[in-house]
Amino acid sequence: IYFIQRAFKATIDHELSVEEADAMLGRPIGLPKTAVFGLMDLVGIDLIPHVTESLVSNLPINDPFHEIAGAGKESVNSMIKDGYTGRKGKGGFYRLNKDDGKKVKEARNLVTGTYQTANRRAGFPSAKMGKRGLSAIMDCNDKGAEFVTDVLLDSLSYAAYMVPEVSDDIYAIDGAMKVGYNWKNGPFEMMDAIGAKSMVKRLQDSNRLVPPFLALAAEKGSFYNIQSGEITRLSPNGEMIIVERSGEYLTVADLKRRGKPLNRNGSASIWDMGEQVLLVEYHTKMNAMDPMNMEMLLNAVDMAESGNWKGVVIGNDATNFCAGANLGLALFAANLAAWKDLDDFIALGQDTYQTLKFSEVPIVAASAGLCLGGGAEVLMHCDAVQAHSESYVGLVEVGVGIIPAWGGCKEYLGRVQEFSLASNGPMGAVMKAFEVIGTAQVAKSAEQARSMGFLSPNDGITMNRDRLLSDAKKLLIEISVGYTPPEPRTYSLP
């Protein structure tokens, strides 16, 4: 609430449009694209006055929230009066209007109260610096950077001001903001990214007060640290306390803190997950499939088959499991008429996926986010999948004028037959597979992926992203007992 109110006030003070404010306070700083005004539309603008009044009446008189409470009050009250309460009403700071029968997104002018076509390129040049970190944005010399700096300095220092009143566990506070509001990093993680000492200097240079807890972090060096491979957090008494996490939590970041990969190249790494289980982690852009991560898959299977390993999990911490093949690589080869290289790429993929399918050890995929094209084919060639609930699975190749080349077509046809997803008759399964693949249908969730046949009825679904790899490892250990590779399927086509 403080962040929203502070951002509203800064938008008015810096004379920005709602699109400019959201463009700067969304993805460039690690927040969802709804940012501030889009978020108010989502939750309901009519709730804002009630929440603000409740905080004003209950917070101590010296709380910094009082300095910004009620920012944009006239605009908000006018909108509520006219029925502009957000997405549940006629619209809010944004609305959809029709122009010649086409839907047009419009944004509200905070000064005049009128609507105009929303500017989809409203960000300032400093927004592009977000990839380099928060400090890079704040160090820029444009109006957008000044706006972001004002909002972040006050909002982040307010989070430090509220320790220990809200909680003395900053890890819990950061977790609440990440899970509850889908922030990429919590406020204390963001201050560590900027640097605790840098935060103090920026506050002092702008004549702002430095909260005692932030000053303590600057003295200690940071809010978080690593001790013997475990995360530690700063407590209000100055001690660095090991963050206690459920034993069900496991991420690649945990493995990286505790050791080094068993093997790696520019596209993928092989990790020891513990309990004799290997993990293959992709780290290409969008985790796209290329020859080098296929090489790591083959290496992992070879290691598992020849060593004392129970099997291989394929997964990562990234937003997306695998967005498909590296089509840029394929297009580059095609433009050079390097047809043999293109053939080799396709053949390597087919060999790799068949190796996953018929390995002497079980292979489990831990899917999350986009699992498209070659990524969906990986899932279908594994013995089992442990899917995060927000897994988007589909064979989308026809969308760019190609067909699945690594076994997805025959695997999906087999699943349609096995799971009885089509009507009876000699052409039922073929027609169903042709329809799904030919129209590039994508499952919008793990449950839908199961109902469409991309996942099997026995595949698992995990709700908590931090538990996904742990659940996948458990599933692999279960199926490793007495494991035998599947028999090749015979396809009888009409």
Segments predicted by a language model, with ranges:
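N-terminal glycine-rich phosphate-binding loop for ADP-containing cofactors
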Residues: 1-312, 316-319, 328-348, 352-361, ...
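Short alpha-helical segment that forms part of, or immediately flanks, the ligand-binding pocket
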Residues: 377
